[in-house]
Regions:
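Active-site loop of short-chain dehydrogenase/reductase
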Residues: 10, 58-59, 85-87, 132-141
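The beta1-alpha1 cofactor-binding region of Rossmann-like NAD(H)/NADP(H)-dependent oxidoreductases
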Residues: 64-75, 107
Length: 141
């Protein structure tokens, strides 16, 4: 459907890229020529996904990181930038959830989910965005 080199020269970070939709997106981006970075909390899951991508001929690297921690995000983004230049794309895929009827969802449960989805997405988008603006780079989220 797409030209095999569609994303050649692109450097894309997929949060929550070790499993599920994030893994599938990262794998497809790599097949289309992108250099892919994935992050998540479970290092072993990330490493398995990176191995699969590399074994399929792609380029990928993993960073274990909790996106709820802004300092950890900044450190990770600094490492990625130092590893070959600026990212050109960011996919905010990381999410948290658990099965619970709405009537049983507690404020603490909602906070656990929203810290990943809202705050984590903001922290990582802000970390990339401020660097893109500073370096006059057109990144994509």
């Amino acid at each position: 459907m797409f030209k095999d080199t569609l994303l050649e020269g692109k450097r894309i970070l997929v949060t929550g890229g070790g499993s599920g939709l994030g893994k599938e997106m990262a794998s497809e981006y790599a097949k289309l020529g992108a250099e892919v970075y994935i992050c998540g909390r479970r290092k072993s899951v990330l490493d398995d996904t990176v191995k699969e991508i590399i074994d399929a001929g792609g380029k990928a690297k993993a960073h274990a990181c909790d996106i709820r921690v802004s300092e950890a995000i900044n450190d990770m983004i600094d490492e990625i930038w130092a590893d070959g230049g600026a990212l050109t794309g960011l996919v905010n895929n990381a999410a948290g959830n658990f099965i619970s009827p709405t009537k049983d969802l507690t404020p603490k449960g909602f906070e656990a989910i929203s810290n990943i989805v809202f705050r984590g997405s903001f922290y990582i988008t802000h970390a990339c965005g401020t660097r893109w603006i500073k370096e006059d780079i057109k990144g994509s989220v």
